[in-house]
Structure formats: C-alpha cells, structure tokens
A protein has these predicted regions:
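Long, acidic (Asp/Glu-rich), low-complexity accessory segments flanking structured domains
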Residues: 20-76, 83-116, 121, 174, ...
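N-terminal signal peptide c-region/cleavage motif recognized by signal peptidases
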Residues: 15-19
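Catalytic cores of phosphodiester-bond-cleaving enzymes
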Residues: 105-149
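Surface-exposed substrate-engagement region within the catalytic domains
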Residues: 151-283
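A cross-family signal for N-terminal binding/gating loops and helix N-caps
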Residues: 81, 130-132, 297
Length: 313
C-alpha cells in the first residue's frame, strides 16, 4: 500500500514538473534564438481577433484568454479597438464588446508578461473597429505616448530589425493611418478579403514590403478546402524568404461563410489540415501565422509546430 502511494506521489510530481517545464518553454521559446536573426525570418504564431471570446457563432474567434494565449506561445496579437463613452478603448469584434479595455486589461497584461519574460517580443496589430475616428486617435495617441509605457515599445520599425533589438518590447503594426505620432509602423494598401502587398511605413517614412494573405469571406463551408489551398500557397511564398531577404509575411488562417458558417466551423476544418501541413521537422520561415481557436488540439499543434520550426536545421 505504501509503495503504491509513493509511486502515485512520484508520478504526480513528475507530471507537475513536466507541465511546469513545458509551460516555461512556451513562455520563453524565443530565448534560445540568436539575437542576430531578423524578426522577419522567424516562424511566429499569432491569433486573429485575439480578444474575441464572445459573440457566438458569428463573432467568436478564440477560446483562450489573452493571458492563456501568451502562455501557450502566441506572440502576435490582432487587437480591434473602439472608442467608448467612458473615454477608454474597448476591445470589439464588429459590434460585440469583449468586456476588455486596452488601457486597463490588454496593454498592462502585455507589459507585465514582457517584464517577467524579457527574452520575448510581442507584435501587436491595432485596428479601429467602428466608432468615432477622432476619439479613437486621441485616446490611442495619449496611451501610446505615455512615458509610463514607452520603454516597452519599439519606436521605429525597419525591415531588417533583429530579434535582439526587440526583446522585452512590443512592435506595433497599425492597420489604420489615424495617428500622426506612433511607435512601430502603419499599413498602407491593405486590401479587404485579399492576398496583397502592403507597405509598412515607420514615423520617418521608411518603407518595408509586407505580403498579406487575408482571404476570409467565403460563400459556404465547403469552400474551406479553398482557404487551405490559399494558406499553403502563401506559406510556400514565405518559405522562399531567403536569409538575404527582409520581406515580411502574414498569413491569416481565419475564414467565415456567414450566415451559413462562422469562424469556429471554418477553424475546425482549416486548423486540422494546417496542423498536418506545418511540419516541425522541416526548418523554414513560415512568417507570422494568425489562427482562430488557438486552444483546440489542432490550434495548439499549429502553435507548437511553428515554434519548433525555428529550431530545426
């Protein structure tokens, strides 16, 4: 009896230790990557509409909180904001408020994570999601220029920015051109529901080319196979981003066919196939890959394989 109890205790401790080690590896997976590697030559997992846990079939895109996503290894976040009557920026997906505020819930979470894990870097994509543009610009500008936060921000974007220059900091990519003074880069030429080349401009006007696959609107769920094919074509393009190239790639694996099928229905099919297609054994720069429902088995497999691809020879 005593022997059985001892074995149970040992097994429990082993499971807890293994779990803790795995969690720590996900929290600091960038730690073992060389400072000299350009950020654009990494495979980086991200989430589409990262804060959208509410909204049902039409609007929910995630099943994990932002903190849970961070701990899983997600390093790119797609945050949609709307200026609210309480003079804060609320996180929205379309018309659905996600019960989160940028100033009090999101940015403090990101900066605290970076303080605790200074080997990591976050890429945060910001987009206005409805509401008054002037209020949005004013509130976001005030927040991003507050000296309380600016030490965590990468002020100027450049195409060949190195991981070592980004550790412990946030690189902002602004989908809108609404701020005169901003950290990071603004997007110019991002077409809706398309694969396209986008120009990233920093505050000094320096330009970088970003290849974006964001074809998300389909007529019916049976077209999920077409979405997978589109994703794989774009990932193949990223694969040929040789060491002397500084072209950036963002691939969105998210899609919808409303009113027939929403993001979760597509994610069930797309993530399963994508998890099989992204092979951790083959070293290649996949670029940034944005997925829905990161907490599912297939979602976690995609994230794990993207991370592991950075360490394969």
């Amino acid at each position: 009896m005593k022997k059985t109890i001892i074995l149970l205790i040992i097994n429990t401790l082993f499971i807890l230790l293994t779990s803790a080690q795995s969690s720590n590896q996900c929290n600091e997976w960038m730690k073992e990557i060389a400072d000299t590697l350009p950020l654009c030559q990494l495979s980086i997992p991200g989430t589409h509409d990262s804060g959208a846990l509410d909204g049902g079939e039409a609007f929910q895109t995630q099943d994990l909180t932002l903190e849970e996503q961070l701990n899983l290894g997600v390093r790119v976040f797609d945050i949609r904001l709307k200026a609210c009557e309480n003079h804060q920026l609320g996180v929205y997906h379309s018309i659905v408020f996600q019960d989160l505020y940028w100033e009090t819930d999101v940015l403090p979470l990101f900066t605290t994570f970076l303080e605790q894990h200074p080997s990591e870097t976050l890429i945060v994509m910001l987009k206005k999601e409805g509401g008054n543009g002037d209020d949005f610009s004013r509130l976001l500008s005030q927040n991003l220029n507050d000296t309380l936060h600016t030490r965590f921000f990468i002020p100027h974007f450049k195409e060949d920015i190195l991981l070592g220059e980004c550790r412990g900091k946030i690189l902002f990519i602004h989908r809108d051109q609404l701020l005169e003074k901003f950290p990071g880069a603004q997007c110019h030429g991002w077409k809706d529901n398309a694969t396209c080349l986008v120009t990233l401009k920093d505050p000094h006007g320096n330009e970088t080319i970003l290849s974006v696959e964001d074809e998300y609107q389909f007529a019916e769920l049976s077209h999920a196979k077409d979405k997978v094919a589109t994703i794989m074509r774009h990932l193949e393009s990223a694969k040929h981003n040789h060491t002397n190239s500084h072209k950036w790639h963002i691939t969105y694996a998210s899609a919808t066919a409303l009113p027939e099928a929403g993001p979760q229905s597509f994610a069930t099919i797309v993530n399963a196939q994508l998890a099989q297609e992204i092979h951790a054994q083959t070293h290649r720069p996949y670029g940034i890959v944005m997925i829905d429902f990161a907490g599912t088995t297939d979602g976690q497999t995609i994230i794990k394989n993207l991370i592991n691809s950075n360490f394969q020879k």
